[in-house]
Amino acid sequence: MAAVAVTPISLTPGVLAEALVDLGAIEHNVRLLCEQARGAQVMAVVKADGYGHGAVQTARAALAAGAAELGVATVDEALALRAAGISAPVLAWLHPPGIDFRPALLAGVQIGLSSQRQLDELLTAVRDTGRTATVTVKVDTGLNRNGVPPAQYPSMLTALRRAVAEQAIVPRGLMSHMVYADQPANPVNDVQAQRFTDMLAQAREQGVRFEVAHLSNSSATMSRPDLAFDMVRPGIAVYGLSPVPELGDMGLVPAMTVKCTVALVKSIRAGESVSYGHTWTAQRDTNLALLPVGYADGIFRSLGGRLQVSINGRRRPGVGRICMDQFVVDLGPGRPDVAEGDEAILFGPGSNGEPTAQDWADLLGTIHYEVVTSPRGRITRTYREAHTVES
């Protein structure tokens, strides 16, 4: 029987609203990704504060579960991991002009390079610190975003070869990023893989030998083992959200549950209306619950009158507009089965019938990445180890 991560969802005492992150789910997901990688190393991406889950805590969980390296966008994100005592290899790949790479070199952060200008700035820091830089070159294979374009790649290789000869850099990796993150069968993936393979061979021909090559995102890690190269670079799957929602959960366990306490229960009469603009009017006598979170906390205003929350095991519809600090749900007529202080689950894994981040994404016309990176403000992030049960 498979072990499934289950997290108790009771609110932390004294917390008004909470984003509970199940670190056991993170570990489960990374172990699954390591299995899917089939011998390739796993770089767990913890950028954007761990996709809203907390970079430090999720990085530790990912490393404990078998991830070999960590990936972030910015040097500051990498330095925050170092400041927390994380010593595993960390790669940062998004840099503004004029960045000071010296703190990164002193902290042993690997630098991703997308242009010769970035290489020149890095070499300035190498000279200033006396530290050799470990670099990964990011190449553009079709996304037309970050990365060295094919036309500039030959001159970049020449500059890299010169820097290697001067013992200024160690060429650790070659990386690229996929266009179709959620379509593993899209033929563009194969076009990109071939371009990436060609650029890897071109580097060898020019005397630049990279230790590792990595192209695969979460989707490719889970469904395209032929694209694994030496390392895979999953992001959203680390947090238990399916990189291909049409294929179901793919064995992943969502790690985040967002919930709050019921602040107030009240009754209204048929014909009375709720919240700004009176966009919802009760058709019968009913009971309402007030939830003390709003759009300032990452509860999208556009979900007003459309979202559902789970209270005492039942889904309840939100009614009226979502306000800055609060919104209202309809409990229905009769004697209320919800009391002040009860727990309201806005979204979670869905294992107990509660809405999921994917449900919110469908309502919003967006992706679940945006949903889980949105909780903020008065929503306190907390962590619990999972209990493991047999299914």
Swiss-Prot record:
It comes from Mycobacterium avium. NCBIfam families: alr. InterPro entries: Ala_racemase (IPR000821), Ala_racemase/Decarboxylase_C (IPR009006), Ala_racemase_C (IPR011079), Ala_racemase_N (IPR001608), Ala_racemase_pyridoxalP-BS (IPR020622), PLP-binding_barrel (IPR029066). This is Alanine racemase. The active site is at K47 (proton acceptor), Y276 (proton acceptor). Inhibited by cycloserine. SMART domains: Ala_racemase_C. It holds the Pfam family Ala_racemase_C. Keywords: Isomerase, Pyridoxal phosphate. It catalyses: L-alanine = D-alanine. Coiled coil: none annotated. GO terms for cellular component: cytosol. GO terms for molecular function: alanine racemase activity; pyridoxal phosphate binding. GO terms for biological process: D-alanine biosynthetic process; peptidoglycan biosynthetic process. It is an enzyme of class 5 (isomerase). The lineage of its organism: Bacteria, Bacillati, Actinomycetota, Actinomycetes, Mycobacteriales. Substrate binds at R145, M324. The modification N6-(pyridoxal phosphate)lysine is found at K47. It comes from the Bacteria. Belongs to the alanine racemase family. Its cofactor is pyridoxal 5'-phosphate. Pathway: Amino-acid biosynthesis; D-alanine biosynthesis; D-alanine from L-alanine: step 1/1.
